[in-house]
């Protein structure tokens, strides 16, 4: 099975690339809720509840999971000795997880279990670093380590100079001004 990640700074189209992959699956006849499922962290309500969304407004319905085991419990159930796919997800092939950086550290083990033991491919999108360029606190560093494929993207530089180069970091803005390293 496969664990695949889309990572990079904000505005590098991580979610957009994942939505395009979902559209390919749907075009191939896959059905959400049977062949694949989409998850987002419950705290990400920027574009409404129950969706993953690009900054341009492209959206896909999603299950809003409050933590890693909520995500696992949506597709699997404990049979007394191990997690098994729920009957309604017997044909599940793939899950998509947006904003993976917001989940708890258990996501690393949950994703590995879903991939290795349940035989389900996992696609994840999330920030790999903070505005300082340091690893984003949470599960992303561990998820990148266990991923079979890591796609790291750059955003378009939006500095006042509009340099046109690829941006490798997310710029934190405080009161309309770019934050310093210690802000």
Model-assigned labels for residue ranges:
Residues 1-84, 130-142, 155, 180:
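Conserved P-loop
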Residues 89-94:
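Short acidic/histidine-rich motifs immediately flanking catalytic phosphotransfer sites
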